[in-house]
């Protein structure tokens, strides 16, 4: 939009000669940068000095506010900024002005809001993200005395200012990364901050790790210098945080390489600290992340001549996760040709993917048009379409509701939406189904009066106005969901897109089942759900209450073909994101030693396993015949719960359902130290509230099982509060409650 202004006009009575509409256009088209210039911890409060970098001449018409937004919940607070002269503004914040009480895992993003001073001016406020230009910003951290948690300022990978709430933080920031013909040189600052442990850093080492069948680990010492310069401008209490400027040099000739294949190293930092008693404490960081998306980190390549062939060294970062790495390979003509062809092939595959994507878009558009046409046809009254996990299973809450309605409401016509590759169980049981995404399915879905689904439907499906959509969901939330997720690492999407699409699909839900009040609160916020929440307990758990008897257990054991005279341990570990050697090459082993378990417990127990399919397909149970049984592909995990005397799991949410049986549980967590950061992405304190003991070794597991086997064993003290919080609504009548709410009697 162009704007023409008569420069001969003059201001009258101190007022601008521009109209409000002209001013609006000018401010919307003016670049305004809001920059945090300084940050100081003033005895518990954070003092912020903010500079507004703009040529806009109408800023005097606006009042500026600092806005804080908690990333997970969306809760906001704001307060006015005080002008200290020119375009600089000052303010002070503490825990009391945060939009909600301080809790572990919170992240607050900072914005500057420009609001018209005059109430009669009809203009939306202008919101700008606050960027940061403060060196070593973490030094201004504060420990909240009420919660004993760190309130930690930091700069995001996009250069913006935020604070996060943590118990501890391993700080690693990079200033410069260079490569020469001799070495890789890295400078920056690092440290360790904690609200609990007063560790003093003794040494830091840079670790280069290569995975695969022949793992390599190399250590390089880091030169440290205490970071004290300018500290007086950041802290009024004189406290010197455990932060150090560092420099590390990695001689290229000391990095192992192979003439046959490329070696790829990930970078870690090893901390060696002293505790209060002078004892050495050692721990590693997670894989090092560059933390600056503006830095493309290109051109960091060095080629060295050796006796055999030239060797190429490259420092790189992964595009999405920003993790740093070093690639090393020979640079012979043969290798260069190989990578040249590989690059050409990669570009060809990329073009094919683009063409396929365009074709799929066209197909989706056609399907959507047909669906909308079909939805205008008369509704088929009392027709219900059920779907579980994208049509791949006959399971979960939809199954429980279907079986209840089949017995108690035969007047309804009920069909299952089934992926044709997973239709065998439906054929065996004689359950009516329609192949998912077929033409018949499209018309059936469009004309059905009810949908009963436990996961998201494709986003392109428009819900007809005559259809009632019951979303059952599929579990009590343990890990963060949807809008509560800080980052999303999934192929084909990003955090913003994932959240937007999730909320768009969730807006179609008319009813949502919640197993307890804890879940209701999370679902409402994370899904931004504002329609009817049915707080009923989970229908799928009716089976665990109504059929918990010796006859049912005996029948299931016969069906599973397992011994009836032995106790059963269900081992259901989760899949780890890092459970691989390289892309497409996974680790197919178990942390729990089955040899040792059989030797100590084989006379009294058997083990049934519910594993990730990649492990299940490649793990050989031959040596454990008669002791360990693989039921990873068994369709109904409820039946595995029912026959099990004991559950062993780790961070899987299966324990919420198993708790309904009031049977013992063990949590086998050998990697709890490295997994702890992920645990802090959970909704509750897993280590404190887990309804059973945490064990780290097979020996500890065996000892715990022997204690459970004793006649005087009682469930741990933590089980009662856990059951009261998560299972109090489960009574065997959840299906009935849901059906009576959604399928109202006519």
From Swiss-Prot:
Induction: Positively regulated by WalR. Mainly expressed during exponential growth and rapidly shut off as cells enter the stationary phase.
Keyword tags: Cell membrane, Cell wall biogenesis/degradation, Membrane, Teichoic acid biosynthesis, Transferase
MF terms in GO: CDP-glycerol glycerophosphotransferase activity
One BP annotation, GO: cell wall organization
EC code: 2.7.8.12
Entry's Gene Ontology cellular component terms: plasma membrane
Pathway: Cell wall biogenesis; poly(glycerol phosphate) teichoic acid biosynthesis
Subcellular locations according to the entry: Cell membrane
Membrane-topology annotation of the record: Peripheral membrane protein
SUPFAM superfamilies: UDP-Glycosyltransferase/glycogen phosphorylase (SSF53756)
Source domain of life: Bacteria
pH-activity profile: Optimum pH is 8.
Record field: catalytic activity: 4-O-[(2R)-glycerylphospho]-N-acetyl-beta-D-mannosaminyl-(1->4)-N-acetyl-alpha-D-glucosaminyl di-trans,octa-cis-undecaprenyl diphosphate + n CDP-glycerol = 4-O-{[(2R)-1-glycerylphospho](n)-(2R)-1-glycerylphospho}-N-acetyl-beta-D-mannosaminyl-(1->4)-N-acetyl-alpha-D-glucosaminyl undecaprenyl diphosphate + n CMP + n H(+)
Sites where the protein binds CDP-glycerol: 473-477, 540, 573-574, 610-612, 652-653, 657
Coiled coil: none
Disulphide bridges, residue numbers: none
Record's keyword annotation contains Translocase: no
Role: Responsible for the polymerization of the main chain of the major teichoic acid by sequential transfer of glycerol phosphate units from CDP-glycerol to the disaccharide linkage unit. Synthesizes polymers of approximately 35 glycerol phosphate units in length.
Family to which this protein belongs: Belongs to the CDP-glycerol glycerophosphotransferase family.
Record protein name field: Teichoic acid poly(glycerol phosphate) polymerase
Provenance organism: Bacillus subtilis (strain 168)
């Amino acid at each position: 939009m162009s704007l023409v202004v008569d420069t001969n006009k003059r201001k009258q009575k101190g007022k601008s000669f521009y109209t409000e509409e002209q001013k609006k256009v000018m401010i919307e088209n003016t670049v305004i940068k809001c920059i945090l210039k300084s940050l100081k911890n003033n005895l518990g409060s954070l003092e912020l000095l903010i500079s507004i970098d703009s040529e806009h001449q109408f800023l005097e018409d606006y009042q500026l506010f600092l806005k804080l937004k908690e990333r997970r919940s969306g809760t906001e607070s704001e307060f006015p900024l005080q002008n200290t002269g020119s375009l600089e503004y000052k303010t002070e914040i503490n825990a009391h002005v945060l939009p909600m009480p301080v809790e572990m895992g919170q992240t607050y993003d900072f914005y500057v809001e420009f609001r018209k001073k005059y109430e009669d001016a009809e203009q939306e406020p202008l919101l700008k993200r606050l960027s940061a230009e403060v060196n070593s910003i973490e030094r201004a951290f504060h420990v909240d005395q009420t919660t004993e948690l760190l309130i930690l300022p930091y700069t995001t990978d996009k250069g913006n200012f935020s604070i996060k709430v943590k118990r501890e933080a391993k700080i690693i920031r990079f200033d410069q990364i260079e490569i020469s013909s001799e070495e890789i040189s890295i400078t920056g600052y690092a440290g360790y901050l904690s609200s609990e442990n007063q560790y003093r850093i003794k040494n830091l080492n840079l670790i280069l790790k290569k995975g695969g069948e022949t793992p390599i680990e190399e250590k390089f010492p880091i030169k440290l210098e205490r970071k004290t310069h300018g500290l007086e401008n950041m802290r009024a209490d004189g406290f010197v945080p455990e932060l150090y400027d560092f420099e590390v040099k990695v001689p290229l000739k000391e990095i192992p390489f192979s003439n046959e294949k490329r070696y790829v190293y990930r970078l870690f930092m090893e901390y060696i600290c002293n505790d209060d008693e002078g004892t050495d404490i050692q721990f590693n960081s997670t894989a090092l992340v560059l933390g600056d998306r503006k830095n493309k980190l290109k051109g960091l390549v060095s080629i060295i001549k050796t006796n055999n062939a030239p060797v190429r060294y490259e420092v790189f970062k992964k595009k999405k996760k920003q993790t740093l790495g070093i690639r090393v390979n020979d640079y012979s003509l043969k290798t260069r040709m190989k990578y040249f062809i590989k690059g050409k092939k990669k570009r060809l595959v990329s073009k094919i993917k683009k063409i396929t994507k365009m074709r799929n878009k066209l197909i989706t558009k056609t399907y959507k048009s047909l669906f909308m046409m079909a939805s205008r046809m008369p509704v088929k009254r009392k027709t219900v379409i059920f779907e579980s996990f994208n049509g791949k299973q006959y399971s979960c809450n939809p199954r429980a509701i279907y079986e209840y309605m089949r017995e108690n409401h035969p007047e309804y016509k009920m069909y299952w939406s089934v992926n044709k590759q997973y239709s065998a169980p439906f054929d065996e049981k004689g359950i009516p189904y329609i192949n998912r995404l077929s033409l018949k399915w499209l018309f059936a879905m469009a004309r059905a009066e009810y949908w009963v689904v436990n996961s998201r439907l494709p986003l392109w499906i428009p819900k007809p106005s005559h259809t009632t959509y019951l979303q059952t969901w599929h579990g009590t939330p343990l890990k963060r969901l949807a809008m509560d997720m800080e980052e999303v690492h999934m192929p084909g999407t990003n955090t913003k897109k994932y959240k937007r699409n999730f909320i768009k699909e969730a807006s179609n839900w008319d009813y949502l089942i919640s197993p307890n009040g804890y879940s209701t609160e999370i679902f409402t916020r994370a899904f931004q759900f504002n329609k009817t929440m049915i707080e009923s307990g989970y229908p799928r758990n009716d089976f665990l209450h109504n059929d918990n008897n010796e006859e049912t257990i005996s029948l299931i054991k016969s069906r599973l073909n397992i011994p009836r005279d032995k106790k059963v341990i269900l081992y259901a570990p989760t899949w780890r994101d890092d459970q691989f050697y390289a892309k497409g090459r996974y680790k197919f082993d178990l942390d729990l030693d089955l040899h040792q378990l059989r030797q100590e417990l084989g006379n009294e127990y058997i083990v049934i396993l519910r594993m990730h399919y990649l492990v299940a397909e490649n793990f050989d149970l031959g040596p454990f015949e008669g002791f360990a049984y693989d039921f990873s592909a068994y369709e109904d995990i409820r039946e595995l719960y029912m026959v099990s005397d004991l559950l062993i799991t780790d961070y899987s949410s299966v324990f919420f359902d198993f708790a309904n049986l009031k049977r013992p549980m063990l949590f086998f967590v050998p990697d709890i130290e490295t997994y702890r950061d992920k645990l802090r992405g959970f909704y509750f304190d897993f280590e404190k509230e887990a309804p059973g003991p945490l064990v780290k070794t097979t020996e500890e597991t065996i000892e715990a099982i022997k204690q459970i086997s004793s006649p005087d064993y009682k469930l741990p003290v933590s089980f009662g509060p856990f059951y009261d919080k998560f299972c109090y609504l489960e009574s065997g009548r959840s299906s009935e409650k849901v059906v009576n709410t959604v399928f109202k009697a006519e």
